Amino acid sequence: MANTTGRIPLWLVGTVTGTLVIGLMGIFFYGAYSGLGSSL
């Protein structure tokens, strides 16, 4: 974990991005499946 000063570690970027993508997809599919997506 050397030479990471002033930069965001790639593993942190990947983890946050993956979590956000999965969360957004989960909310989208859950809303569409439960019928809430059609009312938005």
Curated annotation (Swiss-Prot):
Return the InterPro entries for the record: PSII_PsbJ (IPR002682), PSII_PsbJ_sf (IPR037267)
What residue intervals traverse the membrane?
8-28
Q: Which GO terms describe its cellular component?
A: chloroplast thylakoid membrane; photosystem II reaction center
Task: Name the major location.
Answer: plastid
Q: Which Pfam families match?
A: PsbJ
Lineage: superkingdom = Eukaryota
Membrane topology category:
Single-pass membrane protein
- Keywords of the record: Chloroplast, Membrane, Photosynthesis, Photosystem II, Plastid, Reaction center, Thylakoid, Transmembrane, Transmembrane helix
| Keyword Nucleotide-binding listed | no
**Where is this protein found?**
Plastid, Chloroplast thylakoid membrane
Give GO BP annotations, semicolon-separated.
Answer: photosynthesis
Q: Which family does it belong to?
A: Belongs to the PsbJ family.
- Assembly: PSII is composed of 1 copy each of membrane proteins PsbA, PsbB, PsbC, PsbD, PsbE, PsbF, PsbH, PsbI, PsbJ, PsbK, PsbL, PsbM, PsbT, PsbX, PsbY, PsbZ, Psb30/Ycf12, at least 3 peripheral proteins of the oxygen-evolving complex and a large number of cofactors. It forms dimeric complexes.
What task does this protein carry out? One of the components of the core complex of photosystem II (PSII). PSII is a light-driven water:plastoquinone oxidoreductase that uses light energy to abstract electrons from H(2)O, generating O(2) and a proton gradient subsequently used for ATP formation. It consists of a core antenna complex that captures photons, and an electron transfer chain that converts photonic excitation into a charge separation.
What is the recorded name of this protein? Photosystem II reaction center protein J
Lineage of producing organism: Eukaryota, Viridiplantae, Streptophyta, Embryophyta, Tracheophyta
- Quote the gene name from the UniProt entry: psbJ
